[in-house]
A protein has these predicted regions:
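Short alpha-helix plus adjacent loop in nuclease-associated cores
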Residues: 96-101
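Glycine-rich phosphate/adenosyl-contacting loop at the front of the ribokinase-like
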Residues: 1-64, 69-83
Length: 172
């Protein structure tokens, strides 16, 4: 892959996707036997980082993880993709997020419950510690799968530093 040389900071979510396929989505109170289960990396922020990496950008991923097996999945995946993980934050009190995804194998309709976990606990002080990183970036990519106050603060920092901001308003 050609390296485009753009320095991109991605500020956002990482969750582990837990996906099950079923013959139909369950009604309230119903249990449905699934046919396939898959587990893998996800989250809108992480997905932005993967897309930027595949486009050839130099990506630094900023998210917050717990101290758990899902955090290991996050770091292993990011390292395999050669993303800079030096600014990943950690929580001692909250677990890494996950998404519970049910997919109807006939219609492909889905239902998703996302538990944002640690990436929803990013503090003002943690955002402030990223000012130099943001200032060295050409782009800041972010979305609304972390606490909104942290997104507002990091976007304000980027604007002050003259950094281009791409805000995906998902999951709204």
């Amino acid at each position: 892959m050609e390296h485009i040389g753009k320095k991109v900071t991605v500020f956002g979510s990482f969750v582990v996707d837990l996906m099950g396929r079923t013959p139909h989505l369950p009604a309230a109170g119903e249990t449905v036997k699934g046919t396939v289960f898959k587990m893998g990396p996800g989250g809108k922020g992480f997905n932005q980082g993967v897309a930027a990496h595949k486009a050839g950008a130099d990506v630094t991923m900023v998210t917050k993880l717990g101290q758990d097996a899902f955090a290991d999945i996050a770091l292993n995946t990011m390292n395999e993709l050669h993303m800079d993980t030096g600014r990943v934050l950690y929580s001692d009190t909250t677990e890494t997020g996950c998404a519970l995804i049910m997919v109807d194998e006939n219609s492909s309709q889905n239902e998703i419950v996302v538990i944002l976990g640690a990436c929803n606990t990013i503090t003002d002080q943690e955002v402030d510690s990223l000012e130099d990183l943001v200032g060295q970036s050409e782009y800041l990519l972010t979305q609304l799968e972390t606490n909104v106050s942290s997104v507002e603060r990091i976007v304000d920092t980027a604007y002050r530093k003259g950094v281009k901001v791409i805000l995906n308003t998902a999951p709204v």
